[in-house]
């Protein structure tokens, strides 16, 4: 009898434990919600229904002209999925309803006969390679609501060729999406551009200098990929985002300054910059991605406003050995100096001449000038990117004229 009572008590206790376990109860609704997702077809189109939207996922390969509905089963069509129309070689015309906000990567890529696309009035995002290699695509009007354009979205289209013929710096809604038709060694990006699009300058092998306006806030993935001769570029202070591979294989780049707003250096952002020697980081980094500095054998000096403890706390991805070899200058003062005022005294005098002459002489015999990045910038009077005898001459002339009572500005001299 005692054994029977103990057995019954154990069974009842086990059942009570199972019934009272809160994590068992939600499993069924989660499973049911996943199963509730619907797919179906309407005309030549295949769709998926979510709780708040319909997504176009595929199209019949034999379709020639397609008009996508604005609503399916009472839900608005908000999205065209990745690869939905990829390589539809018979497709010639598409009308996309105004409900659509996003067209994903490769959605219409390699539609070789596609000639006209009517984009929605309130479109926000055009994915990477969205219309790439649609060789006959000529009629396309990108609405002003578009804020995100993935890399190579229009590569290989007749539309892009027309735009390049009008201006080799192709802009859409203040995004510079393509500069591949440029042949100049120096390119000045016009004011008002807010983003350098992904791969916009890629493989411009003749490019030596890029001047970016203060309006730029983002440099897209692969923006300067394989610009082998790029030597000079100043990243504007307003930039907050530099995406992966932005400066990948910029072999001639020797130094670069990262503005304070940038907090992450993503994967391979400076990979294979074989001659990169000096890096100035004005802000506080929260992450350095995998291989961000791989194959940068000459990286020797890094100036940062961060403390040693904060620097060592940064999560660093694999393949960043050059960071371990470089000398890190912690808590570096990176204040802006007046032109030629290397001692930050507020005036230009013989002391500044001494510092400039000493630095030029040390550089001439292969030694480091000993200047901070701010001092080097202040010593480059003519803005040539190098401090030399010309800059020394300008400083001496500036001091001599002002000492003689002849009011002289740098604009009068340079």
What do these predicted ranges mean?
Residues 82-84, 104-107, 127-130, 151-153, ...:
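Consensus positions within tandem repeat domains that build extended binding/scaffold surfaces
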Residues 16, 52-55, 176:
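Hydrophobic residues embedded in beta-strands of well-ordered beta-sheets
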